Each structure stands twice: as structure tokens, then as C-alpha cells.
């Protein structure tokens, strides 16, 4: 918002500044199970590739690693995000919690860093989902009849991403009804495939025995899962319980994709219908139903992950799951098509498999649209409020173009490979979960009383250490995700700081608040008196009597001209929009406006002048000279809200009120 637009918002009677930002539009609210499907298009769609990634990462240990993943999900992620839902019930998630807990520029840079990881999460969701959708399309038997030039993994992936961007440029948005249909059909088809596999294992228990015997013998099959040639006579090292447990814990982070979806789960909170008794300050019904959503989605996903892992590990040869194999990145689709000569249920085959592929492709594309929508909501939510967004961020279309361009670059960088992008995706997911753990840990610590050791929430700390280990392992094993995240962080910080510098000449004042009714009454009195002179005074130096004598002498003010003094104390200078608090006192025959909790001095003084500006004659602001260098003063203004105040006030007033006859006058002497 420019200074001129703020001035237009000032009432003609000079009664003060009004809110400069549009009020948030209400969200359409629905039953929590339907909203679960909206977040489920992101969370549940990972079933399309998670079982295959589990095998390539953990080999025959995949079922055990998946069980550990489920335990971490149910006893780690779910409790953490249930607390996030309670502490941030308006859909802003863990990032908003940390912003409240960490103040100043440290908090702003922390938010920008987390936005970089969130951008990684959402962008990779778009590219990875499109890549796996392309994989399912290419491997479908009916698609084999298509011309050879259409069988390009990169080409189809880019086409899907560009189509998604074009739809958003046209104004297409996802709706809950479509999400419900897609999720229900996709989950039912996956349930049929998994149930068919489990029934086969019940009929042929020797398949489980064979898997277990090879596992106990130490034949993990990890090399084969990566497409590497298996040794003709591998050295057998029997696997003990301890070594199996240790390897499972070490391999578990590679399955971290199964933890995606929780941040989205709290982001959709405004769309959940709560109780009739809910209030804005305490939406207890919405919080409770969001916690139902988080637990229900985690339970559904846990059952699906364990079932799919057991079925895929025991029924599909490792060689088929290896890179380049027919089941690579599409394990459940491989079973649905009855490939490999094994028909789990009589109706499995090309027809059922094609239905499964269509459902998978649709939900993966919808997951991409959900991620793009998430970014379009996330970036404008923070950056404009920080004064760190250029004007075009407010428009959807330019932001869509930037995000789609990033998706195209990432797709080309990873050659549209699902496996290669999985680590980058997991990096963004784990850092966001880790930020939620940190926010919950700090909040619980501050809530408790007693000694330092008694205040520490040990359970939350242990969960945080598990996620810290997971995130660290992913970043060390595959640093691509960290590199991409750092690129996004650098881009966001660069644009944000440049934008903050360019927007430093805006008024930035949302409204004035008052410490008590007396101050409000005196404010109204000053507006009706049409104050002729406003004089800033820095507390702690000269007394007001000395300041007034010097002011009248240097500025040739008669004794009968009243002077209102303004004392400004800064609050959080990292904030952009400000709501200064006014304490107006009457001492020694003069009015003193004591301003606190403001982010910047010059916009505060300019806003005061506009609000107190008389209808018959302009108000005058009288300043003294400063001996500081211009560069130091300008830098101090951008970073700390101080600096060359008289010049900046004059610039702000010129932009706000073009009419020189009505504009408050700035006098320096």
C-alpha cells in the first residue's frame, strides 16, 4: 500500500487512519471428513510411489521400516500437529507459532527460511506428482499404441505442469467435492489391490516365509533394488534382532515421504465447520474436529502404508522394482495390471489396471494443484505483512508464472525422476515438521513453572530429536533437497529485503490505539482544536521547558501559539505495518502525545500529522538539525525505523497529500 493510497483512506474530518488492509474473506466451511479429503489428495497420493521408494531405499527391510514410520507418525507427528492445531487454529500452522514466539528480525529471517523450505515442499510436490503421473501413463498398456515421441517422461511431466499453470491462470480452483470423489475412489482401488495381495499371502504363506528367510539370512536386496547387479554368490551375514533394529532405524529416514500432509492438515483448518458456540478467539469445535482429521488421516495412511509395503515386498521380485524395472515407481499399479504372471484377484488385468492408473493420475494432478494453491496462499500471507513483497505478489497470475517456472527448472534438473526428487521432497517435509516440534517445545516450556528441568517437555524434545535425526540423515545422504531449499531461501530473502527497502517510504500505519479512554478523549479534543504546531521530542535529553524555549526562539513562535509535543518510543522495528499506542497527557499547560509500540518513527509522525491536520490551516511539524551522515540515517530508517526523520516525514507527506495548500508543513531549524 503506497502512502498516497493510505492518505485516501483518511476520513475528510481528520478523525484518524483506518485499517489499510482488506478484511480477510470468509472460507467456505464443510464437514471435517470432506475437508480430510482435501488435504488427502496430497497425503494419500504418495501411495502411488511410496511403496516403490520404500523398496529401493530399504530393500526387504521395507515392511519393518514402514512399521517404524507408522509409529513415528502416530506417536510423534500426530501429537505435535494436534498441538499446532490448538495453538494456531486459523490455518497458519507452525510457521505462525514460531513467528509469535521469536520476535524481531530474528523471527522474520526464521519465517523467511521456513518459507524457503515450504516452497521446496510444495514445488517438489507439484513436480514429483506430475512425474509419477507421467510414469503411470507411459507404462499403461493402452498408451503403448501412442506415437513414440509421446513416450517422453520429461515431456509429459512438463506438459502436465504447464497445463496446471494454465488452468490456474484461467482461475480454476480445486473444490472439496472433487477432492472427496478422487480420494474415495483412489483409496478404494488401493484397498482392493492391497486386500487382494493379503488374500494371496494367506493362501500362499510360503511367500512370507521365503521373504523372512532371506531377510534373516542377511539378503536385504538393497543393491538389487537400486538396479545394481546382485553378486552371483553373495556373502551371507545372518541378521540378528539387534542388527535388524539398528538397520531399520538407519533406513527409516529414507521413507520420510510417508510423513507428508500434516502441515496441509492444519492449513485447511479455516474450511472445517466447528460448533455453533465457536468464537474467533476460541474455535474449540474447529480445533477438536481438526484433531479428528489429523488422527483419522494418519490411521488410514498407516494401514495403507503397512499393507502396501508387505504386499509389494513379498509379491513383486526385487528386480522388477529396481530402476528401469516394470514395477519401478508404480508398484501397486504393477499388481493391479496383473503383470509378472500373478493375478491377485480374477478381475485384475489391463482394464482394472487402467482404471487404477486413471485414478492415480487424477489424484496426482490434483495433489499438484493443491500444492500450487498452498503456495499461492502461503506467500501472500507473510511477505506483504512484512513489507517484503513487491506489488505483483498481490496478483495471482504473476506468482503462478514464477512458481511454474521454478517447477519447470526442477523437473529438468531431476530429469522428471520420482526417486531422485524424493529426497528433496522429504527435506522440505521434515524441516516443516521439525519447525512444528520446535514451536510446540518452546510453547510448552514457557507454559510450565518451576525449575528449568521441570519445565522441559521431555516427550516433545525426544520427538524433536527423532525428526532432527531424520532430517539430518536425509540432507547428508542426498543434499539436493538442501541445495534447492537454500536456493529458494536465498531467492525469497533477496526479493524480500529489496522489496522492504523500496517500500520503506510507505506510511504503514494501520490504526492508532489508546492506552485508556482519557487518551482517546484528549485525542478527539486535539483534532477539534486544530493543533498548529507538532514538535517531536526525544525523552531523556533536555526537559520539555528547555525544548519549548529553544523551539520558540529558533522557529520564531509566539507565546500564544500552542505546541503539542510528541515522544516516540520504538517497539519491534522489524514489523512493517504498525498500530502505534497513544498515551496523551496534559502536563505543565501543554499536551504531550507519548507513542509506543511503533515500528518506525517517520511514518508514525506523518500519520499523526495527517490525522491532526486542520481543515482551515495545515499543521506544522518542527524539527531540529541532525549531524549524522545521510547514509547512516537512511540505513537506520530501513532497519531500525530511525534515521533522517524530518526528510522522510516530508517525503511521506508529499506522497500522501499532493495538494500543497492542505499538506502539513515540515520545518527544520
Identify the meaning behind each predicted range.
Residues 104-108, 148-159, 273-304, 380-415, ...:
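Loop-to-transmembrane helix boundary motifs in multi-pass membrane proteins
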Residues 23-29, 34, 84, 88-120, ...:
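Transmembrane-helix boundary/entry motifs in multi-pass membrane transporters
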Residues 197-210, 277-283, 296-333:
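Extracellular/periplasmic helix-exit of transmembrane alpha-helices
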Residues 209, 213, 390-399, 433-482, ...:
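C-terminal membrane-solvent junction of multi-pass transporters and transport-like membrane proteins
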Amino acid at each position: 500500500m503506497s502512502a498516497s493510497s493510505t492518505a485516501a483512506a483518511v476520513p475528510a474530518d481528520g478523525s484518524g487512519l483506518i485499517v489499510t488492509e482488506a478484511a480477510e474473506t470468509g472460507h467456505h466451511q464443510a464437514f471435517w471428513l470432506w475437508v480430510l479429503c482435501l488435504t488427502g489428495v496430497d497425503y494419500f497420493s504418495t501411495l502411488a510411489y511410496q511403496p516403490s521408494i520404500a523398496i529401493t531405499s530399504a530393500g526387504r527391510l521395507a515392511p519393518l521400516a514402514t512399521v517404524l514410520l507408522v509409529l513415528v507418525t502416530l506417536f510423534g507427528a500426530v501429537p505435535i500437529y494436534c498441538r499446532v492445531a490448538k495453538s494456531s487454529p486459523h490455518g497458519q500452522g507452525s510457521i505462525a507459532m514460531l513467528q509469535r514466539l521469536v520476535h524481531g528480525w530474528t523471527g522474520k529471517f526464521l519465517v523467511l527460511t521456513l518459507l524457503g523450505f515450504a516452497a521446496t515442499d510444495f514445488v517438489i510436490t507439484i513436480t514429483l506428482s506430475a512425474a509419477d503421473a507421467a510414469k503411470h501413463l507411459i507404462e499403461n498398456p493402452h498408451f503403448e499404441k501412442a506415437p513414440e515421441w509421446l513416450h517422453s517422461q520429461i515431456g509429459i511431466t512438463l506438459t502436465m505442469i504447464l497445463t496446471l499453470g494454465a488452468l490456474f491462470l484461467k482461475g480454476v480452483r480445486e473444490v472439496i467435492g472433487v477432492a472427496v470423489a478422487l480420494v474415495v475412489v483412489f483409496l478404494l482401488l488401493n484397498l482392493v489391490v492391497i486386500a487382494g495381495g493379503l488374500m494371496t499371502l494367506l493362501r500362499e504363506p510360503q511367500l512370507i516365509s521365503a521373504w523372512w528367510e532371506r531377510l534373516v539370512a542377511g539378503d536385504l536386496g538393497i543393491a538389487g533394488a537400486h538396479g545394481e547387479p546382485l553378486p552371483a554368490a553373495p556373502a551371507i551375514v545372518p541378521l540378528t534382532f539387534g542388527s535388524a533394529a539398528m538397520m531399520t532405524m538407519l533406513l527409516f529416514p529414507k521413507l520420510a515421504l510417508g510423513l507428508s500432509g500434516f502441515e496441509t492438515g492444519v492449513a485447511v483448518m479455516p474450511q472445517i465447520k466447528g460448533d455453533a458456540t465457536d468464537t474467533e478467539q476460541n474455535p474449540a469445535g474447529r480445533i477438536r474436529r481438526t484433531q479428528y482429521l489429523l488422527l483419522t488421516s494418519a490411521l488410514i495412511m498407516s494401514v495403507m502404508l503397512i499393507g502396501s509395503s508387505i504386499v509389494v515386498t513379498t509379491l513383486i521380485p526385487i528386480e522388477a522394482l529396481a530402476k528401469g524395472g516394470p514395477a519401478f515407481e508404480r508398484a501397486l499399479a504393477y499388481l493391479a495390471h496383473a503383470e509378472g504372471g500373478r493375478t491377485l484377484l480374477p478381475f485384475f488385468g489391463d482394464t482394472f489396471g487402467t482404471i487404477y492408473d486413471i485414478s492415480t493420475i487424477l489424484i496426482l494432478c490434483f495433489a499438484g494443484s493443491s500444492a500450487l494453491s498452498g503456495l499461492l496462499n502461503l506467500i501472500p500471507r507473510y511477505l506483504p505483512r512484512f513489507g517484503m513483497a513487491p506489488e505483483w505478489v498481490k496478483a495471482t497470475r504473476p506468482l503462478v508464472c514464477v512458481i511454474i517456472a521454478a517447477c519447470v527448472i526442477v523437473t529438468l534438473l531431476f530429469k522428471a525422476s520420482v526417486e531422485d526428487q524424493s529426497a528433496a521432497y522429504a527435506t522440505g517435509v521434515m524441516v516443516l515438521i521439525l519447525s512444528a516440534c520446535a514451536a510446540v517445545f518452546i510453547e510448552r516450556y514457557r507454559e510450565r513453572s518451576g525449575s528449568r528441568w521441570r519445565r522441559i517437555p521431555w516427550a516433545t524434545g525426544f520427538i524433536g530429536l527423532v525428526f532432527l535425526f531424520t532430517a539430518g540423515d536425509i540432507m547428508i545422504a542426498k543434499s539436493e533437497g538442501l541445495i534447492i531449499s537454500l536456493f529458494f531461501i536465498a531467492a525469497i530473502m533477496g526479493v524480500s529485503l529489496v522489496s522492504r527497502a523500496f517500500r520503506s517510504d510507505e506510511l504503514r500505519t494501520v490504526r492508532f490505539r489508546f492506552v485508556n479512554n482519557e487518551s482517546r478523549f484528549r485525542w478527539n479534543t486535539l483534532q477539534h482544536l486544530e493543533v498548529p504546531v507538532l514538535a517531536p521530542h526525544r525523552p531523556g535529553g533536555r526537559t520539555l521547558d528547555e525544548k519549548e524555549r529553544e523551539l520558540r526562539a529558533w522557529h520564531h513562535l509566539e507565546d500564544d501559539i500552542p505546541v503539542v509535543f510528541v515522544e516516540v518510543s520504538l517497539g519491534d522495528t522489524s514489523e512493517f505495518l504498525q498500530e502505534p499506542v497513544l498515551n496523551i497527557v496534559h502536563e505543565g499547560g501543554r499536551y504531550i502525545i507519548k507513542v509506543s509500540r511503533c515500528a518506525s518513527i517517520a511514518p508514525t509522525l506523518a500519520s499523526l500529522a495527517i490525522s491532526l491536520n486542520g481543515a482551515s490551516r495545515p499543521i506544522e511539524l518542527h524539527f531540529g538539525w541532525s549531524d549524522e551522515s545521510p547514509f547512516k540515517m537512511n540505513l537506520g530508517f530501513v532497519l531500525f525505523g530511525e534515521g533522517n526523520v524530518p526528510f522522510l516525514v516530508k517525503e511521506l507527506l508529499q506522497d500522501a497529500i499532493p495538494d500543497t495548500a492542505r499538506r502539513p508543513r515540515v520545518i527544520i531549524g
